[in-house]
From Swiss-Prot:
Alphabetized SUPFAM superfamilies for the sequence: MoaD/ThiS
InterPro entries, alphabetized: Mopterin_synth/thiamin_S_b (IPR016155), RnfH (IPR005346), RnfH_sf (IPR037021)
Naturally occurring in which organism (per UniProt): Serratia proteamaculans (strain 568)
Coiled coil segments of this chain: none
Superkingdom of the source species: Bacteria
Protein name from the UniProt record: Protein RnfH
Protein family per UniProt: Belongs to the UPF0125 (RnfH) family.
Length: 94
């Protein structure tokens, strides 16, 4: 069975984590994240609540990866985007 290389990334406002991992062909998004070691390094990553993607497109943990893919772990939103837009619009009126 051949191998694939993928990147796993997790970005915080103050720091970015980028891990290159080599996996067996047919590996999943979840397997790449586990192999990257980011779950142990960052206790705030919870795969049950954090969304993931491949090159900015939403993905599921079971999705199969291709060679050269970039797996992204997204942080939860801290504010509702609709509420923020409403607040900016009100502020602009003043």
């Amino acid at each position: 069975m051949s191998e694939i290389r993928v990147e796993v990334v997790y970005a915080l406002p103050e720091r970015q984590y980028l891990r290159n991992v080599t996996l067996a062909e047919g590996s999943s998004v979840e397997q790449a994240i586990v192999a990257s070691g980011l779950l142990e390094l960052r206790g705030d990553i919870d795969l049950q609540s954090n969304k993931v993607g491949i090159y900015s497109r939403p993905a599921k943990l079971a999705d199969v990866l291709s060679d050269g893919d970039r797996v992204e772990i997204y942080r939860p939103l801290i504010a509702d985007p609709k509420e923020l837009r409403r607040q900016r619009a009100e502020k602009a009126k003043k």
